[in-house]
Amino acid sequence: MTPDWLLWQIADSAFPAGGFAHSAGLEAAWQAGQVRDGDSLPEFLAVGLSAAARGVGIFAAVTARTPQRFGEVDAACDLFLNNHVANRASVAQGQAFLRVANEIFGSAALERLGKLVRRERLFGHYSPVFGACTAALGIDPPAACRLFMFMFLRGLVSSAVRLGIVGPLEGQSLQCRLSPRAEELAGILHAASMEDVVQTLPLHDLLQGAHDRLYSRLFQS
């Protein structure tokens, strides 16, 4: 299978990695009134994209370039995700993504990664797993960074639609308008190193940490 086909298959919403069970803090922000309606949603998505490109996305970029650093990057990701909701969601998504990728693609490199996570009792966070999996499948790092940002944006937009903040057509229009920004951030992500990791959205982090205390919730995080 060519790298392009692999990209399309992983980007397909039918790829069963469990990402749609998570809202990346949007549900908590919605209930807290930080996102009030469709008019305030674009700003939330834009700052969320920037935060991902300067935070968790860097872990994916580093393991996409240097998968042999997976253990080190995975441990750093665990330290970075210091709110328990985001940390738990990242581990759940990462282990699900690795398991599904192994079952679907049957790559020897993916199998070795799965054994490493189990043998060393690593966390298996989503971002480093994502990058290492793309490297194992022969997807070049710039394409992996673009795929990461696309999937992050698509996940946020999908969450907004399911929460009823916007409708499906408005959601797709919003995704289209934000795509150039996501593309720009993917370029920044590709050039980033571990020393560049930073939390640019502490309020978002606090809101996401309160997700477990919501009276009613649609998403796991």
What are the functions of these language-model segments?
Residues 1-221:
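Metal- and O2-centered redox machinery and metal/ROS homeostasis
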